[in-house]
């Protein structure tokens, strides 16, 4: 914080292939993760690995160009560490994006799902970023998660999408996080769909848990970059290149959506 005069109130986390959101910021100041003491490093293609400060529609923002995942070998607490850094900077609202596989049979590639709730599958086995001694300076020992995704922000996202004529590909649903890096099997996809998940991915949830623990409001959106395979006769296979290509095609509209949203906060 000694190297920037910016005091952001909005934090933005860019998902795979969506790092262009950071380019929307004015008066940008960029710091590589490698130059930040004790900060993890991005190792995934499509994640630039830098923290960008600036303003967006009059709001002071900090943007993560690249996030961290369990499959990179980081402890879950390290994956979500940036959320506590955000809190200490003064961030009040976090907007998170990710790339996800569609489980809902009504979804299409290129749809954007506003996350209304999540299933923390690794959490069933104790993989939760709040495990260990509670950091009382951030929040309580047992934080509720029934309001993890701010309902007013979700409503605002729908309103803004309608104003920008983007409603035709907007959805709202439940996101399930898995550990990765292997994509899900057919049986796993069928199970997750029956559990009530509309989309599946490998990020976001751990960040949201820590952000909510610290009292920040959260809005999260998934870009549906592939449809999960749930048919044993299908020859389709998920791949990361497909994820990045879909993100590239939808990037401009997502940037407009997020930029307008930030201006309304």
Feature-to-residue mapping (PLM):
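Metabolite-binding pocket within alpha/beta catalytic cores that recognizes anionic/polar moieties
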Residues: 1-145
């Amino acid at each position: 914080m000694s190297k920037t005069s910016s005091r952001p109130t909005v934090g933005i986390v860019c998902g795979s292939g969506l790092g262009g959101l950071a380019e929307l910021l004015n008066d940008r100041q960029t710091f590589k993760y490698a130059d930040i003491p004790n900060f993890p490093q991005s190792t995934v293609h499509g994640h630039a690995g830098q923290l960008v400060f600036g303003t967006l529609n009059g709001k002071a923002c900090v943007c993560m160009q690249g996030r961290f995942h369990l499959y990179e070998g980081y402890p879950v607490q390290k994956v979500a560490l940036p959320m506590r850094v955000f809190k200490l900077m003064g961030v009040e609202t976090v907007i998170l994006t990710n790339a996800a596989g569609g489980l809902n049979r009504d979804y299409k590639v290129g749809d954007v799902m506003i996350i209304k709730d999540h299933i923390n599958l690794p959490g069933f086995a104790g993989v939760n970023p709040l495990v260990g001694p509670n950091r009382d300076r951030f929040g309580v020992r047992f934080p509720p998660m029934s309001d993890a995704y701010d309902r007013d922000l979700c409503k605002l996202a729908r309103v803004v999408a309608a104003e920008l004529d983007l409603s035709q590909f907007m959805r709202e649903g439940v996101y399930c996080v898995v550990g990765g890096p292997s994509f899900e099997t057919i049986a796993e996809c069928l199970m997750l769909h029956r559990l009530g998940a509309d989309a599946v991915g490998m990020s976001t949830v751990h960040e949201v848990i820590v952000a909510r623990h610290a009292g920040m409001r959260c809005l999260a959106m998934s870009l549906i970059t592939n449809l999960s395979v749930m048919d044993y006769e299908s020859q389709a296979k998920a791949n990361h290149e497909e994820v990045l290509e879909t993100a590239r095609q939808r990037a401009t509209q997502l940037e407009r959506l997020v930029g307008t949203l930030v201006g309304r906060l």
